[in-house]
A protein has these predicted regions:
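Short hydrophobic/aromatic-enriched beta-strand-loop microsegments
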Residues: 139-147
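Nucleic-acid-interacting cores, centered on viral/eukaryotic replication and modification enzymes
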Residues: 199, 244, 258
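Polybasic low-complexity intrinsically disordered regions
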Residues: 2-124, 129-137
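Short amphipathic alpha-helical "interface-anchor" segments enriched in bulky aromatics
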Residues: 163-224
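Short, acidic/turn-prone active-site loops that include or flank metal/cofactor-
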Residues: 91-96, 146-152
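Membrane-interface transmembrane-helix boundary segments in multi-pass integral membrane proteins
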Residues: 221-235
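Short, charged, surface-exposed secondary-structure boundary motifs
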Residues: 99, 152-160
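Short helix-capping/linker segments at secondary-structure and domain boundaries
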Residues: 216, 238-252
Length: 258
């Protein structure tokens, strides 16, 4: 593994997963979520401050389920209903989901994973009117970000005007029709967002599988390069499991608890 760069290794793993799983269809659904990747530094025995981590490749982070930890934040994208992992990002510490939303979509587009018209399901951590708008206007995808209590549909619809780039295209009317279709679909899906909660919850079972069955819970790796490669291996193992047809909530939980 040491002979390959992180980018080469990630490309290799995602290429393997693509070859062993079913080919994608049109307008597919992706689920995106994040989890902590904790490094085993025994910080309970010896107090470690932020100053102690200056110059290190890992940072203090916070997870609502785990509390404070030292390590990274793993953001994973999986295809639904196959649950095949298709991309991941690793960040030091625990940056806010809404702040890295744009970077996530850039990565999905760069790797040609998210295509025009695809639907991406995300939890409330990614919430923000700007993020809904970016999904359609820049990335041409439908970002079903679970709304918060103060969400106003009218406010969002008022923000979704045609991007100026549409009028520079060879067929602006066709582009406008496609844009209207994205907006209409986003509105319908946000009005019924609770129907997507069981779908989004499947990625939690994927994380549980990776942590409990494949030991992603605590890594004995202390450089970002090494952590990325080992996360790649965990993603590959998860992909192999779901490629065997093990992709129901009950089956995934059974393996994770085995």
């Amino acid at each position: 593994m040491s002979r390959f760069s992180e980018e080469q290794f990630i490309g290799f793993v995602l290429g393997v997963l693509s070859s062993i799983c079913l080919k994608r269809g049109r307008n597919r659904v992706l689920i995106v979520d994040s989890t902590d990747v904790s490094l085993d530094l025994n910080w309970f025995r010896k107090k470690i401050t932020k100053a102690d981590l200056a110059g290190k490749e890992f940072k203090w982070g916070y997870s609502s389920s785990k509390g404070y930890y030292i390590g990274y934040k793993l953001t994973l994208a999986i295809e639904y209903p196959s649950l095949r992992p298709v991309a991941f990002l690793l960040h030091q510490g625990s940056p806010g989901d809404a702040k890295i939303y744009e970077e996530i979509l850039e990565e999905l587009k760069r790797r040609r994973i998210a295509r025009n018209g695809d639907t991406i399901i995300l939890d409330k951590g990614y919430y923000g009117y700007r993020n809904y708008v970016l999904g359609i206007s820049r990335f041409k995808v439908i970002s079903v970000i679970f709304p918060r209590k103060n969400f106003k549909m009218g406010k969002l619809m008022a923000m979704l005007s045609y991007p100026l780039s549409i009028f520079n295209r060879s067929n602006p009317e066709r582009e406008k029709e496609f844009y209207r279709g994205l907006v209409k679909s986003l509105k319908a899906k946000l009005e019924n967002w609770e129907e997507y909660k069981p779908i989004r919850s499947m990625i939690e079972d994927i994380f549980k599988l990776a942590k409990s069955a494949f030991s992603l819970k605590n890594l004995h790796r202390y450089t970002e390069r090494s952590v990325k490669k080992f996360v790649c291996l965990h993603v590959l193992l998860v992909g192999i499991v779901v490629s065997l047809g093990i992709n129901s909530k009950e089956e995934l939980q059974r393996i994770a608890e085995w």
